[in-house]
């Protein structure tokens, strides 16, 4: 009953409220988060079963490594170069799709950031594959 009163008071005062164990009394939910550098993945069950969000977060923590975070940093640099040097929107989209692919990440993992940058620059300057 106290939680409901607090929630109702918050609603009247236009203050966001989160009653963790009562999803119907939540204006927002706090997701479980996996963060690897600038890569951030948020998982939520909208308050229905936070334990499952936590379980999924643990699985994703094993799947996504710090290498993924470093890859995002390199993608950001490549994206800036593409935006500065490639005037055609369709070509920019295609290049970004190529560079953000699984194959590109595998190349990054196998050869390292410096080689990947060279590989990315060749794609940016050359014809689409």
Predicted regions and their residues:
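Short beta-strand and adjoining strand-loop segment in the mid-core
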Residues: 1, 39-47, 62
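ADP-ribose/adenylate-binding Rossmann-like module
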Residues: 1-30
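A generic structural signal for short beta-strands and their flanking turns/coil linkers
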Residues: 13, 37-39
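Solvent-exposed alpha-helices and their adjacent loops that cap or buttress functional pockets
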Residues: 32-36
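An accessory alpha-helical subdomain
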Residues: 47-129
């Amino acid at each position: 009953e106290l939680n409901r009163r607090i929630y109702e008071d918050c609603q009247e005062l236009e203050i966001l409220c989160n009653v963790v164990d009562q999803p119907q009394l939540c204006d927002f939910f706090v997701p479980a988060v996996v963060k690897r550098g600038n890569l951030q993945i948020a998982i939520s069950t909208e308050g229905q079963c936070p334990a499952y969000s936590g379980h999924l977060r643990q699985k994703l923590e094993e799947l996504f490594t710090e290498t993924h975070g470093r890859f995002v940093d390199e993608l950001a640099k490549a994206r800036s170069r593409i935006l500065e040097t490639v005037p055609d929107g369709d070509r920019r989209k295609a290049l970004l799709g190529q560079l953000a692919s699984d194959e590109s990440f595998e190349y990054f993992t196998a050869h390292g950031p410096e080689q990947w940058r060279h590989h990315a620059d060749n794609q940016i300057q050359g014809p689409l594959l």
